[in-house]
Amino acid sequence: MAEIRNFTLNFGPQHPAAHGVLRLVLEMDGEIIQRADPHVGLLHRATEKLAESKPFNQSIGYMDRLDYVSMMCNEHGYVKAIETLLGIEPPLRAQYIRTMFDEITRILNHLMWLGAHGLDIGAMTVFLYCFREREDLMDCYEAVSGARMHATYYRPGGVYRDLPETMPGYQPSKWHNEKEVAIINRNREGSLLDFIEDFTARFPTCVDEYETLLTDNRIWKQRTVGIGVVTPERALQLGFTGPMLRGSGVEWDLRKKQPYAAYDQIDFDIPVGVNGDCYDRYLVRIEEMRQSNQIIKQCVDWLRKNPGPVIVNNYKVAAPPREKMKNDMEVLIHHFKLFTEGYCVPEGEAYAAVEAPKGEFGVYLISDGANKPYRLKVRAPGFAHLAAMDEMVQGHMLADVVAIIGTMDIVFGEIDR
């Protein structure tokens, strides 16, 4: 009798559902997966090593490029670690601005996840809907930093600058005439806070539209219910964090359990799943978008009523205002020193973690008293999730691999670093 052997299949790295450069070596019995071996490292850029050769401030831009769809949350973890070593506390207004932009980033990330996850499984419409809202939020990034993605807006001691009083508007072009541009610009006539407030009023209706397309859709449920089930105990053992852990029914969120920035002064709920499958993780992320919208609303209200400084008044750490540089030689020297050799951080080590959209993004920083980190270690949430791939796909069909990769919300920038 002929020997029956398992079939080995390479999934990725050139695959639209591989979310970057994932290579999976799948051992299959017919259509059923027996084993999955993820191969990582194809997007390794030596970020941790690069940070050791640059002054502390110059590595903020590298953080944006780790998980490149949750940019400001990565920056937050890094500057938080530096602030711990320096022993400085950002002004309260800066804390609220950070909280607001962390939540804008969370919505940006979840919209990208939902659109891509839907497209992977075959729901094309939701992809177009999600990118419609992402445009507005990227304009918020652009308003404060000039960049739509890699903002480099957070600084040790606060944020780069206060929220602008005007919003950039669209100009007439060969694609949009003056009448169309006037319609697009109608909510851009006020300040950035006005624009964000207008967005928060519209966004719940947009989430309802996504749910109309997917939540009760029987094809969506057939593809996600009971797929990639992880028990609460196993999720904790595997080091899951964020929506992957909460989807399994564990109520753990750093914003509540270890509050940072202004989260201890804001009212919001933690959505938690029941079954630990792809469908529950989808519902958790959908509800997180609604909660983030509520947090942004509260931040906008507070920021309107409380003007003030947005960065510490210490020119050894924070850049001085340009007006002072024109009149005061000492301030000019501070500016020159800050942007050439930076500042020396006291000897010691610190771990700072933030609740990034994908889970706990942690930065472990060791300083030897120089102006560069001695060692920078990034704790990427996606790495722990990808490590569970073999366990999650065993016994499932080949088509379910795509649903499981999608539900993990994997970005290889942070996994390969």
Curated annotation (Swiss-Prot):
Subcellular location, record wording: Cell inner membrane
Q: Where are the transmembrane segments?
A: none
| GO terms, molecular function | NAD binding; NADH:ubiquinone reductase (non-electrogenic) activity; quinone binding
UniProt enzyme class:
translocase
Q: Which InterPro entries match?
A: NADH_Q_OxRdtase_suD (IPR001135), NADH_UbQ_OxRdtase_49kDa_CS (IPR014029), NDH1_su_D/H (IPR022885), NiFe-Hase_large (IPR029014)
Q: Does the keyword Isomerase apply?
A: no
Q: Which Pfam families match?
A: Complex1_49kDa (PF00346)
Q: What are the protein's UniProt keywords?
A: Cell inner membrane, Cell membrane, Membrane, NAD, Quinone, Translocase, Transport, Ubiquinone
Q: What is its main location?
A: membrane
**Coiled coil residues, start to end:** none
Q: Catalytic activity annotated for this protein? A: a quinone + NADH + 5 H(+)(in) = a quinol + NAD(+) + 4 H(+)(out)
Q: How does it assemble?
A: NDH-1 is composed of 14 different subunits. Subunits NuoB, C, D, E, F, and G constitute the peripheral sector of the complex.
- Family, similarity comment: Belongs to the complex I 49 kDa subunit family.
Its recorded name reads NADH-quinone oxidoreductase subunit D
Q: Which organism is it from?
A: Nitrosococcus oceani (strain ATCC 19707 / BCRC 17464 / JCM 30415 / NCIMB 11848 / C-107)
Q: Source gene?
A: nuoD
